[in-house]
From Swiss-Prot:
Antitoxin component of a type II toxin-antitoxin (TA) system. Upon expression in M.smegmatis neutralizes the effect of cognate toxin VapC32. The lineage of its organism: Bacteria, Bacillati, Actinomycetota, Actinomycetes, Mycobacteriales. It comes from the Bacteria. Keywords: Secreted, Toxin-antitoxin system. This is Antitoxin VapB32. It is found in: Secreted. Pfam families: VapB_antitoxin. It comes from Mycobacterium tuberculosis (strain ATCC 25618 / H37Rv). Residues 46-65 are annotated as: Disordered. InterPro entries: VapB_antitoxin. One of its GO terms (cellular component) is extracellular region. GO terms for biological process: positive regulation of growth.
C-alpha cells in the first residue's frame, strides 16, 4: 500500500545511522514492525498472572537423589 507521510528528517537520519539502513521505505517498515513487536510484548506482559484458574505446568524432570 502506498502512503504519504511526513517524517522528521533528523529522526529519519538517526534511524538510518543506527541501523545502517538507508532506504526510507525499509526504515519505516522496520520501525512499524518493531513498534508492533514491542506493543504486543507489553500487552502480553500486562496479562501476566491474570488467570485465577491457572495451574503450574507439569515438570518432566524427576526429583534429584
Amino acid at each position: 500500500m502506498r502512503t504519504t507521510v511526513t517524517v522528521d528528517d533528523a529522526l529519519l537520519a538517526k534511524a538510518a545511522e543506527l541501523t545502517g539502513v538507508k532506504e526510507k521505505s525499509t526504515l519505516l517498515r522496520e520501525g512499524l514492525q518493531t513498534l508492533v513487536r514491542v506493543e504486543s510484548a507489553r500487552r502480553l506482559a500486562a496479562l501476566g498472572g491474570t488467570d485465577p484458574q491457572a495451574t503450574a505446568a507439569p515438570r518432566r524432570r524427576t526429583s534429584p537423589r
